[in-house]
Amino acid sequence: MNRDEIKQYLPHREPMLLVDEMNLDENHVAHSKYHVTGEEFFLQGHFPGEPVVPGVILCEIMAQSCALLMKDDLIGKLTFYTGIDKVRFKNSVKPGDTAEVEATLTYHRANIYICSAVLSVNGKMCVKGELSFALLPDTRNK
C-alpha cells in the first residue's frame, strides 16, 4: 500500500502522515516504512547541528502503523489512542534514515485494540512499545 492508498484509511495528511508504505503479511503483521528526509517540521530545533526525530514522533509512526492493521475496520472511524505502554527507546532516528515498523495486534475486544510495535533502522531496534486505541465513529464534517 502506498501513501495514496494509505490516505483512504488514515485521516492524517501532510505533514502528519508518517507512513510512506505498508504491507500486511500472511500472519497479519503490518510492515511499514517512513523515510526521514530531514525537511520535517519536527526536526527544526531538535537539535541544531544534530537533528534527531523526537520520541513522540517515533511513537506516532508506530501508532499509524498499528492503526493500519485494522484498515478494513477504519472506514468511517477515527483512532483515539488510550495508552502507550512499555515504550523503550534504544537508538536514535536521524535524517536520511528509513524507519521500519513491525506491528502486531495482541488484543481486541469490541472497539478496543492493543498492538505491539517495534521501530527499527537498518535492522537495529530504535523503539518498541505497546499502543492501545479505540475506534470511534468519524463525526467530522467532510
Model-predicted regions and their roles:
Residues 11, 27-31, 93-97, 104-142:
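HotDog/MaoC-like acyl-thioester-processing domains
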Residues 16-18, 99, 113:
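Hydrophobic core residues within well-ordered beta-strands of beta-rich domains
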Residues 65-100, 130-134:
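Hydrophobic beta-strand-centered segment that forms part of the acyl-chain substrate-binding groove
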Residues 20-23, 85, 90, 102-106, ...:
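Conserved positions in beta-strands of structured domains
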Residues 1-6, 97-101:
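Short Pro/Gly-enriched beta-strand edge/turn motifs at strand-loop
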Residues 14-53:
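Catalytic strand-loop segment that frames the active site of acyl-thioester-processing enzymes
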Residues 22, 53-76:
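Active-site helix/loop of acyl-thioester processing domains in fatty-acid/polyketide metabolism
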